């Protein structure tokens, strides 16, 4: 129906543009493509994959089966698949039909990063399919023909030394890399595939080796951790005279001894069909058994290998002997529409960098940016409504600084657990005076936690399996929820039992109780950011984009250094997200340059401009910094030689030792400077554009001499030299350097900074004057370097650096910072005509939105899920506003009342139990209804006897058929849904019917405890002196006599609406006028009387709702037979008639509302003039407590004082 309605509009647009859809299907496909543009692109690339489900580290090196896999993430299918090879069929299909993003660059970049570049070796000995090739003599590769060369990995790569086992990659992977390398990357063809149904099968030698073969052979554990090697040759089996042929014959298994028998082959037609369908993957079936090749792939028990068809699949299982022996091409596939966990993994857990976890599989990327891209696209698919809903992002920053009170025995380390889940560990450090770590850890995408536990361990000797637990420190999360990090000493807790005390005492070397107990110095901060829907920040974003310069000028004097850094970081990220980073930085920096008196003090102070530039370089140039200085820093830290050249710090040393240190320092500085010069092409274009704009602005002001100083202060003083001085703060290394290495890095950074400042050593540092020779020699190269990074590239277009920014989180942080800093003095200073005059109103609006449980302006549904995306579930149960009930559409704009058919004596099966439909038994007359007696006054107080499963708050009810069960029912397609009992309308029932809408109002009224008006309650509120919307019965039922008395309120109106008490905000429901051709039965003007009250209590289909109020049933009107509600009826009437009808309905509604308001004002004045009270009886006007609030024209009746006016 939606396609039919949109089709004429689309055709008109295409006619205007000169292009018309040839067929309706082409228009439909066009709309589908437009909708698919909102989905994340297809991401694919090589990753290091671990298919396991580890629980903890066990204080030892984790041994998991890491291997290289070609991963494909398809957002349309919501799947994450992993393959052994990069198939041309998959790559070609994605490139031609979908938007794709290559995450790893290319195969050669992946291989170079992980040290998997191929080497040429002669053919290995012929072995069986389940044996391992050994090392042998390798003749020079120049003397071998191409077809006899053998590609393998001779050793574990340097970047994979922390992996316990790394699976081998196929020969085709290295063959393709070799071709790309030799041809300069011009060949982009696919890899040769095996003969199991894939086109382009290769001929010749095809071998897969294990990356850890050499390491396992050297350590004598070849058979325990090494994987199998499969060798297949094009010809028959040959025996080569090689030194390791004896091992191959010993370990090989002949074919006739294999217990698997070869069956008859399937027909050619079935075989071709199976090969054609081989590209499609089956879903994960948790009920099937693990793969037969579990020793090779270590599949978790809950996985089914994708080489086996699904239980209900259409493909037949392959029955050939060769297929059972060989492994499948695809290792696993994860469906993202299940309850999966996605979160980053700290590198200290598995000693694997840039790792993240999805379900029970771990993936390791090349760079942090690559991991951020993978996770961002996965999060968008798992939670597509993230920017349209309220959410909470939790993060934690913790520093493990040092420990004292420990004996000088072996090394110590700490493990950090959040709610008994291990997240990270420190390095092992030996005690000097104190055990100093100085390591910081940042955890993102955290769930809501209660406590942080830091456990202190001491490494044991090689004979023991486990390390010794010294003690632990437990910190409540409420102690860390502050604006700035909390730093203090924490006493290490030990066990209170006798055995525990003796164990701790023995671990501490038998210390007496009089000695100092161990303690840890920890600094930590817990941050929980509450984020509104993204469109709620439109006014704030507009203010920031148009008035960021006056805003920074006003906040500069009132912020401290820490606040400046936080605000500048968030501002830079928001401007980068909206492509305004260059203008923002240039305006801010030039404003500071204009105020600067001394050019030599450029970027020396801690201002918003310097902090913003520093944050921008960290955001876009993180990969550049890692590729430039990471290897150099690690080399310096591995060397224990000192570069100290100050004779006062060295003491009595010989001249030869001093000259040796000078030569080592000179060599280090030259290596660092050379790496910076050689990597100038990797500097991001975003940063070059900023430097180029700054140079152009200075040249326009005739201050060209200041350009080099400004640019060198930015790149060296704020980025490169601080990274050399403190590499752990820039994530170049994880450990804090030793005192000797820290001094070496300080001298290196000091020399490069003097070169960037174009100044020589002397005066206060005479011991560094020997480096003036280096400064003079590299002076002109520094000028050339600064000119190159601040000029447009002439080699061609360059790509901008990518960065993942959460705009909602940053805008929420900016709002928080402004609320703290925007004082009344600043608001008074910025008058009405000032550009910042609306800052206070914008902040007040956001504060009001955050304070309320929901906002009717944005109509953003709350999603019942964890506070962050740590546990994402795409099958989210959307809760409208703050109620814990499903959302349904309001009545369509036809003006008709819905009439139920014959009674089925049970709720409708297609409706949820929280729906607000009335059973047909409600329309029975009092004479026909069983037990039709009058409802007593105690009916309104029967809520004290309601079921425990009934709640009147907006909190999640775990003891009822909650939304989680509803999600399960929806996931099962509605099968096996639990039938809930109906309520009875008799007075003896302990549960009274209600509308099924919940309340946050703590005060329970006898009239209604609902704070969100239901459709029936709104109709009842409008029914006061309104014959159209009245809840009276239809013409087929008896009409009660006119009441003898009318109840009015005695005392004055209650206090006005207080949001602190009624912290709800409902969405006004649309009220449609009844068409004129519908026959509406007459009704009475009042609701008093025995029979009237008896008919007003209606049985509902919602047993969970509160039952302490009586409600009026909706009006029942006679719908003519010729009233057609189908789409054909509206289509035939024409657009003009339909529009005129809508306008008439709106006008009639407006007139009806105005009339109701006038009558309600008159009724209010009469109620205020009455003086008599009612002792025992009360009357229900049909309007709920919330209906009075919604109309804003009626006052709540009093529970205690009511007056009666005689007729």
Swiss-Prot record:
Residues 40-383 form the PH domain. GO terms for biological process: associative learning; long-term memory; negative regulation of Ras protein signal transduction; short-term memory. One of its GO terms (molecular function) is GTPase activator activity. Keywords: Cytoplasm, GTPase activation. The keyword Cytoplasm applies. Mainly expressed in gonads and vulval cells. Isoform c in expressed in pharyngeal epithelial cells and several rectal/blast cells in the tail region. Isoform f is weakly expressed in four cells symmetrically located in the vulval region. Isoform g is strongly expressed in the pharyngeal muscle cells m6 in addition to several cells in the tail region. Residues 1-29, 221-316, 495-516, 856-903, 923-1013, 1086-1107, 1163-1207 are annotated as: Disordered. This is Ras GTPase-activating protein gap-2. The gene is gap-2.
């Amino acid at each position: 129906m939606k396609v039919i309605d949109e089709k004429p509009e689309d055709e008109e647009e295409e006619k205007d543009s000169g292009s018309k859809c040839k067929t309706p299907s082409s228009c439909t496909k066009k709309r589908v493509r437009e909708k698919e543009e909102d989905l994340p692109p297809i991401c694919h690339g090589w990753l290091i994959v671990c298919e396991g489900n580890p629980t903890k580290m066990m204080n030892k090196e984790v041994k998991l089966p890491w291997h290289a896999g070609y991963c494909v993430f398809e957002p349309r299918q919501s799947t994450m698949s992993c393959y052994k090879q990069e198939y041309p069929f998959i790559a070609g299909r994605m490139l031609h039909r979908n938007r794709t993003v290559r995450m790893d660059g290319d195969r050669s970049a992946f291989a170079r990063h992980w040290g998997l570049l191929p080497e040429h070796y002669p053919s290995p000995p012929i072995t069986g399919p389940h044996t391992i090739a050994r090392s042998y003599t390798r003749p020079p590769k120049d003397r071998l023909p191409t077809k006899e060369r053998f590609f393998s990995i001779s050793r574990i790569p340097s970047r994979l030394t922390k992996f316990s086992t790394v699976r081998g990659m196929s020969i085709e992977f290295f063959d393709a890399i070799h071709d790309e390398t030799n041809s300069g990357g011009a060949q982009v063809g696919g890899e040769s595939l095996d003969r199991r149904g894939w086109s382009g099968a290769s001929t010749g030698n095809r071998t897969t080796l294990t990356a850890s073969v050499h390491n396992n052979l050297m350590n004598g554990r070849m058979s325990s951790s090494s994987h199998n090697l499969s060798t297949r040759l094009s010809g028959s089996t040959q025996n080569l005279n090689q030194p390791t042929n004896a091992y191959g014959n010993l370990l090989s298994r002949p074919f006739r001894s294999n217990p698997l028998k070869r069956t008859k082959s399937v027909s050619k037609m079935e075989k071709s069909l199976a090969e054609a369908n081989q590209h499609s993957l089956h879903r994960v079936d948790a009920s099937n058994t693990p793969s037969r090749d579990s020793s090779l792939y270590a599949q978790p028990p809950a996985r089914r290998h994708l080489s086996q068809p699904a239980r209900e699949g259409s493909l037949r299982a392959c029955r050939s002997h060769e297929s059972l022996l060989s492994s499948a091409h695809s290792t696993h596939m994860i469906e993202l529409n299940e309850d999966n966990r996605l979160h980053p993994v700290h590198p200290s857990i598995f000693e694997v960098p840039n790792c993240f976890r999805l379900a029970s599989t771990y993936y390791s990327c090349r760079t942090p940016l690559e991991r951020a891209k993978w996770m961002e696209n996965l999060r968008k698919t798992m939670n597509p409504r993230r920017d349209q809903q309220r959410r909470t992002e939790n993060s934690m920053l913790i520093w493990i600084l040092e420990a004292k009170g420990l004996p000088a025995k072996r090394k110590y380390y700490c493990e950090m657990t959040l709610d008994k889940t291990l997240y990270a560990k420190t390095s092992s450090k030996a005690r000097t005076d104190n055990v100093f770590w100085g390591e910081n850890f940042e955890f993102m995408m955290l769930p809501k936690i209660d406590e942080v536990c830091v456990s202190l361990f001491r490494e044991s000797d090689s004979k023991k399996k486990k390390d010794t637990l010294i003690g632990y420190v437990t910190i409540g999360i409420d102690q860390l929820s502050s604006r700035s990090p909390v730093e203090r000493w924490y006493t290490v807790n030990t066990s209170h039992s006798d055995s525990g005390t003796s164990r701790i005492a023995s671990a501490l070397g038998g210390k007496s109780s009089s000695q100092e107990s161990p303690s840890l110095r920890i600094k930590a901060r817990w941050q929980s950011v509450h984020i509104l829907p993204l469109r709620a920040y439109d006014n704030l974003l507009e203010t920031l984009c148009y008035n960021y310069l006056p805003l920074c000028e006003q906040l500069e004097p009132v912020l401290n250094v820490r606040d400046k850094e936080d605000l500048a970081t968030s501002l830079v990220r928001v401007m980068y997200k909206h492509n305004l980073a260059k203008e923002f930085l240039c305006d801010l920096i030039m404003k500071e340059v204009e105020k600067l008196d001394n050019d030599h003090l450029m970027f020396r102070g801690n201002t918003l401009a310097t902090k913003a530039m520093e944050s921008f370089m960290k955001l876009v140039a993180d990969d550049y910094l890692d590729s430039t200085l990471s290897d150099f820093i690690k080399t310096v830290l591995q060397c224990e030689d000192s570069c100290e050249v100050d004779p006062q710090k060295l003491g009595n040393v010989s001249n030869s030792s001093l000259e040796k240190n000078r030569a080592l320092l000179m060599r280090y500085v030259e290596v660092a400077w050379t790496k910076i010069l050689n990597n100038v092409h990797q500097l991001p274009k975003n940063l070059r554009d900023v430097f180029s704009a700054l140079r152009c602005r200075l040249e326009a002001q005739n201050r060209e001499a200041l350009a080099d100083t400004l640019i060198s202060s930015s790149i060296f003083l704020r980025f490169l030299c601080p990274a050399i001085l403190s590499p752990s703060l820039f994530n170049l290394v994880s450990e804090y350097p030793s005192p000797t290495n820290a001094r070496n890095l300080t001298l290196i950074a000091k020399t490069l900074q003097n070169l960037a400042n174009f100044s020589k050593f002397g005066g206060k540092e005479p011991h560094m004057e020997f480096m003036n020779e280096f400064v003079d020699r590299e002076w002109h190269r520094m000028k050339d370097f600064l000119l190159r990074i601040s000029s447009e590239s002439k080699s061609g277009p360059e790509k901008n650096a990518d960065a993942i920014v959460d705009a909602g989180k940053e805008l929420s942080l900016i709002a928080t910072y402004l609320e703290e800093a925007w004082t009344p003095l600043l608001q008074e200073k910025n008058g009405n005509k000032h550009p910042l005059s609306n800052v206070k109103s914008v902040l007040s609006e956001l504060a009001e939105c955050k304070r309320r449980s929901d906002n009717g302006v944005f109509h953003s549904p709350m999603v019942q899920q964890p506070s962050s995306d740590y546990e994402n579930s795409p099958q989210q149960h959307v809760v409208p506003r703050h109620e814990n009930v499903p959302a349904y559409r309001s009545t369509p704009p036809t003006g008709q009342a819905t009439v139920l058919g014959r009674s089925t004596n049970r709720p409708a099966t297609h409706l949820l139990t929280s729906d607000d439909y009335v059973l047909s038994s409600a329309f029975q007359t009092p004479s026909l209804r069983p037990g039709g007696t009058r409802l007593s006054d105690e009916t309104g107080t029967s809520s004290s006897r309601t079921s425990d499963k009934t709640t009147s708050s907006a909190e999640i009810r775990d003891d009822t058929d909650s939304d989680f069960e509803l999600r399960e029912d929806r996931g099962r397609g509605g099968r096996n849904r639990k039938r809930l009992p109906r309520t009875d309308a008799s007075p003896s029932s302990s549960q009274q019917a209600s509308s099924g809408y919940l309340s946050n109002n703590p005060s329970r009224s006898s009239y209604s405890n609902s704070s969100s008006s239901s459709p029936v309650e709104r109709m009842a509120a409008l029914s006061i002196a309104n014959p159209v919307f009245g809840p009276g019965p239809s013409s087929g039922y008896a009409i009660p006599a006119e009441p003898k008395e009318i109840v009015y309120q005695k005392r004055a109106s209650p206090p006005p609406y207080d949001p602190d008490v009624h912290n709800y905000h409902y969405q006004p429901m649309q009220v449609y006028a009844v068409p004129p051709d519908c026959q509406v039965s007459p009704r009475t003007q009042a609701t008093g009387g025995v029979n009237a009250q008896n008919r007003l209590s209606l049985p509902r289909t919602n047993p969970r709702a509160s039952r302490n109020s009586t409600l009026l049933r909706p009006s029942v009107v006679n719908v003519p037979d010729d009233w057609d509600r189908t789409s054909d009826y509206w289509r035939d009437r024409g657009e003009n008639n339909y529009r005129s009808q809508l306008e008439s309905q709106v006008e009639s509604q407006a007139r009806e509302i105005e009339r109701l308001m006038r009558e309600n004002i008159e009724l209010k004045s009469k109620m205020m003039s009455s003086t008599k009270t009612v002792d025992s009886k009360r009357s229900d006007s049909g309007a709920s407590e919330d209906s009075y609030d919604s109309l804003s024209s009626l006052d709540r009746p009093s529970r205690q004082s009511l007056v009666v006016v005689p007729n």
